[in-house]
């Protein structure tokens, strides 16, 4: 399923933008931003968005009976699969929604659901540390390019993740 891409230079939050688009009648799409100034993680925690890293959200309609725990795990596996193409390191899923390398956070995924006009939609916010990782007190972080011989551009990672979602969401 082809998903329309929406690009923003600067945005408050890709998930918030997806929610606004859903409320305007869009049922699916992918949002990417160069800079996210009010990104958030699970439990309302602030997501530190450093320029050059990847900030995106995928949104699509889902079956109302679909188990959200299943979707969280499924979406994490899709992102993990996309990232594995770039490095030869073990990526682990720290439930419910973090991807780690050597017990350091590489990627955070924030999943939210919205009901609009009798439809249930999911927003999958994805933040990947590509060129640098934030300093977070009490939390170890890492970045993708720390494990590659050749530096990777965020757009290549964006295309890889987008392609997997486009290929697989029709099964949800």
Sequence positions of predicted segments:
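Active-site beta-strand/loop microenvironment that shapes enzyme catalytic pockets
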Residues: 121-131
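N-terminal lobe of the biotin/lipoate ligase/transferase fold
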Residues: 1-85, 89, 107, 151, ...
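Acidic (Asp/Glu) carboxylate-rich active-site/surface patches
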Residues: 84-117, 127
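Conserved, helical-rich catalytic subdomain that frames metal- and/or nucleotide-binding sites
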Residues: 149-172
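Cytochrome P450 core scaffold surrounding the K-helix E-X-X-R motif
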Residues: 131-140
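Structured alpha-helical
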Residues: 145
